[in-house]
């Protein structure tokens, strides 16, 4: 988030792209016992992912220390805490944290409620949600970008540019979501087939994917709006809307 806030989103992108081959290498090596590493089977996937993130942490520390635009901030240097400066980060961070928790928790709760319907229903539901999370990456990315851009423009007292970015961001998110949903609708059998081969599983997964289409268009609008409000330093309203939408309605 610190790197993104400085507008260095490409640095963050390269770090996360680096995580993919690292994760593949450690997972493959520890699951099947390759390159002198022990064969751990399923648990090797968890250990491999943990090791990949540790390597990524080391790389990120090096970037923070060596990157010319990050080095002057001395992020890793120790200074005496200034408690007076904590108020604003907590005022913004706590509602955002509760917002994320509320959204993740409701989907986790739904997963638990699905348990009584049998393993095939759980698997189909999980497959549909997994692909929905992938589709949600587009509006979520636009939301994060709008938070950065809008806050920049507001800081420069440039309300006109901020409004232009807001309109452009929401429009882009809706268009991408619409194209994604059209593609998803006509390719449901292929997507379901990626997660299993049973005909009954594929048919049930297609039903869940159809339901997921209903809320993804709403996410295409809601996610950018959340990013916009955070750019205006308003984190309470997205939290209230999340609480009402996910836990009350």
Label for each model-derived stretch:
Residues 1-12, 111, 124-188, 219-233, ...:
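Small-residue-rich hydrophobic transmembrane alpha-helices
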Residues 1-36, 47-51:
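Hydrophobic transmembrane helix module of multi-pass membrane transport proteins
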Residues 22, 37-94, 150-215:
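Short alpha-helical transmembrane segments in multi-pass integral membrane proteins
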Residues 31-40, 101-134, 152-153, 190-199:
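Helix-terminus/linker motif at the lipid-water interface of multi-pass membrane proteins
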Residues 16-23, 130-133, 210, 243-249:
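Small-residue-enriched core segments of transmembrane alpha-helices in multipass membrane transport
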Residues 26, 56-59, 219-222:
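Membrane-embedded alpha-helical transmembrane segments of multi-pass integral membrane proteins
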Residues 10-17, 54, 59-62, 78-109, ...:
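Hydrophobic faces of transmembrane alpha-helices in multi-pass small-molecule transporters and flippases
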